[in-house]
Curated annotation (Swiss-Prot):
Acts as a radical domain for damaged PFL and possibly other radical proteins. It comes from Actinobacillus pleuropneumoniae serotype 5b (strain L20). InterPro entries: Auton_GlycylRad_Cofactor, Form_AcTrfase_GR_CS, Gly_radical, Glycyl_radical_cofactor_GrcA. It holds the Pfam family Gly_radical. Disulfide bonds: none annotated. NCBIfam families: spare_glycyl. This is Autonomous glycyl radical cofactor. It comes from the Bacteria. The lineage of its organism: Bacteria, Pseudomonadati, Pseudomonadota, Gammaproteobacteria, Pasteurellales. Keywords: Organic radical. The modification Glycine radical is found at residue 103. SUPFAM superfamilies: PFL-like glycyl radical enzymes (SSF51998). Gene3D superfamilies: 3.20.70.20.
Length: 128
């Protein structure tokens, strides 16, 4: 658990009246504010480096962190293979045919023939 403190007594004058977050599980102290140039904001040190101190606790609201690592992306095109193949052969019949490619909406007829073949190949598979 993280505890917020204001140091009220210390033999090190740079620590007096400074504010810290103490993480006893990690044995770390993070400087929030201190006078002088000895301790910088966000500097992390071992709690033991603070030495003998007296402090008063300061209320701290710790918001839970959400870590997003990776993720999944799904593009959905609701149509049949035959429709796209016919659009390749007869583009004039499908001037408004719009598909999703990498999150973007694009007119199928604006793609190059190679891109059209790639979309058909990647969109329609026998199994996952």
């Amino acid at each position: 658990m993280i505890k917020g403190v204001q140091i009220t007594e210390s033999s090190n004058s740079n620590l007096v009246n400074s504010f810290w977050l103490l993480d006893e599980e990690k044995n770390e102290a993070r400087c929030i504010a201190a006078k002088g140039d000895v301790y910088k904001e966000d500097q992390v040190i071992a709690i033991s480096e603070l030495g003998q101190i007296a402090y008063r606790e300061v209320p701290v609201n710790v918001a839970p962190t959400i870590k997003v690592e990776g993720g999944q992306h799904l593009n959905v095109n609701v149509l049949r293979r035959e429709t796209l193949e016919d659009a390749v052969k007869n583009p004039e019949k499908y001037p408004q045919l719009t598909i999703r490619v990498s999150g973007y909406a694009v007119r199928f007829n604006s793609l190059t023939p190679e891109q059209q073949r790639d979309v058909i190949t990647r969109t329609f598979t026998e199994s996952l």
